[in-house]
Every structure is written in C-alpha cells, then in structure tokens.
C-alpha cells in the first residue's frame, strides 16, 4: 500500500506535468527516495492507460526528437505540503547531478551514479 507521503509527492509531481501535456497522467517510476523533508523522483509520464504520451500540440513537441524523455523532480516538504524545488522534463544531460550541492539536498535521495 502506498504511503500518504508517496501519494502527496506524486500528486505534486503530476500537477505541472498534466498542465504541460493537457491530460491526466500516471508514472512509471524509475527511482523515488525520501529523506527527512526532501524527495527525488525519476519517472516517465504515461497516459492513464499506461501508454506513451503523444506530445503533439504541447510545449514539448519540438523537443521529442532531440532530447531524452525523462522527468526528474526534487521536492521539499514545507508548511504541511510538498513543493517542487527543481524539475527537468526532456533533456540531454543528467542535470540533477549538481542538485545535491546546489540545493543542499541530501545526496542519499539521488540515484547512485554509474561511471563506465
């Protein structure tokens, strides 16, 4: 069973995504970790039927060919709710790598980096 914190985090993540893609979404979660009042989510937005989103007519339409379809979100719990501190949707770089230092977020919430 999903925890209350998990549901609140994913609701906070869903709001800007649903606004941007003009539809309700669900997520395939690659990584989610919470520590104290911080959380990091790495997820792929999908349609409510679990299919890939058609970005035609959205702000991401031009990016779909050049960038990776990723969603990384850093959240902080303040004043009784989860707030998005930073998010990256469609990118070619792992921009979250600097977030622990830049936002002073606990490094333990982020995925372990693999170096080849």
Give a label for each model feature:
Residues 96-116:
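Extended, polar beta-sheet/loop recognition surfaces of beta-rich domains
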Residues 46, 60-63, 94, 103-107:
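Short, low-complexity, polar/charged sequence segments that are solvent-exposed and flexible
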Residues 69-101:
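Short beta-strand edge/turn micro-motifs at domain boundaries
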